Swiss-Prot record:
HAMAP family: FabZ
Similarity field: Belongs to the thioester dehydratase family. FabZ subfamily.
Cellular localisation: Cytoplasm
Record-given protein name: 3-hydroxyacyl-[acyl-carrier-protein] dehydratase FabZ
UniProt main location, coarse: cytoplasm
GO biological process: fatty acid biosynthetic process; lipid A biosynthetic process
Length: 154
């Protein structure tokens, strides 16, 4: 990633892999755009038919499991937290899910945008509102909580 991209508030997959411990098949954010400091960001997930969840969910009519949409939201929020923490010894733990709603199915070929906005932060605890959108239409939403912990202190 170039310096210009960082100044514009973007993270490519290599930068995301530095921020998050997740790896295939559980890294659910391909790119992050429009990062506004620690206030908001948009994570991008390109949904493809060859992803392992579609083998069983559902073979005749593949639909992205809602829990994976929530996880994509949480990973986008986690990247915001990790950027703010800036310490290699820190991990971001997903703590809470509230008000989760699933509006429309997400299928292979869709490009999901995880719109994540910080609602509040107190110490190492963060609260976010998250919307998942496909082609501008709301497909899922949730309020999530996260906590930054030092992995050495566990």
């Amino acid at each position: 990633m170039t310096v210009e991209q960082k100044e514009l508030g973007r993270a490519d997959i290599l930068e995301i892999m530095k921020l998050l411990p997740h790896r295939y098949p559980f890294l659910l954010v391909d790119r992050i755009i429009d990062i506004d400091g620690d206030n908001a960001a948009i994570g991008i997930k390109n949904v493809t038919a060859n992803e392992p969840q579609f083998t069983g969910h559902f073979p005749e009519q593949p639909i992205m499991p809602g829990v994976l949409l929530i996880e994509g939201m949480a990973q986008t929020a986690g990247a915001i937290c990790a950027r703010k923490a800036g310490t290699a010894g820190d991990l971001v733990y997903f703590m809470t899910i509230d008000n989760a709603r699933f509006r429309k199915p997400v299928v292979p070929g869709d490009r999901v945008e995880f719109h994540v906005t910080k609602q509040k932060q107190r110490g190492n605890v963060w609260k976010f509102h998250c919307d998942a959108k496909v082609d501008g239409a709301l497909v899922a939403e949730a309020d999530i909580g996260a906590m930054i912990v030092n992995k050495e202190a566990q």
